[in-house]
Amino acid sequence: AMQKSLTRASQRIAQYILAFPRQVTQSSIADLSRETQAGEATVIRFCRTLGYKGFQDFKMDLAIELATTESDDSSPLLDAEVSESDDAHAIGLKLQNTISNVLSETLNLLDMQQVLGVVDALRHCHSVYIFGVGSSGITALDMKHKLMRIGLRGDAVSNNHFMYMQATLLKAGDVAMGVSHSGTSPETVHSLRLARQAGATTVAITHNLGSPLCEEADFCLINGNRQGMLQGDSIGTKAAQLFVFDLLYTLLVQSSPEQARESKLRTMNALDMTK
């Protein structure tokens, strides 16, 4: 009904989004402008008409809406559609395609101003603690390893009692990161809430912008990959989370290359058992 009140250019935008919603979640504003023959300023005005700050906010909400409207009954067991006739190579290609798609989706969903804000907080923090349970806890351990190699103090915590105790002991100047694909893991949400109340800078890494986890976060980084209820071990989710952490890590190294190099050499020497 609202389409009738829109300009012709805005109507083209609306019709394109309705026809190709998932493609829009992986498009830049320039892509959408080109496909609809509407100026980028028109795209932004269209998003603001719908109540969003801009295209990035609209795109995030659209991706979340597409993910949550999937029927639970049709939730797949695997990331890729695998048939009985697929051989090992064919399955490998499908998994490769899954990872490629989810990384493109994640790059489009990330708000780079939020990313740079997290990098700045990490550069100046006293310590960083990463909270996550289950598969997200394993991802947190990987980031802990990366940060230790470049000299940042902190830990990855997945035991809920340890998470709560550590979170409440944080203070201003510390950073707490919560990893949860759904953004609803109660242990991780509670840990980030305690950390925020203690004065720490809080960061959420999740697929769900409207989640309880993001409500407790100063910065919310959105990773891609629509995941079904049966996919707690999803390779797409794991790749998306690792991509976000690797982006933060790479930007940290870029910002202080000499410090990163010195810390890496010291930690490498410490691990050399032949000395």
Regions from the language model: what does each represent?
Residues R12-Y16, R45, D61, V102-E105, ...:
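Alpha-helical scaffold segments in soluble metabolic enzymes
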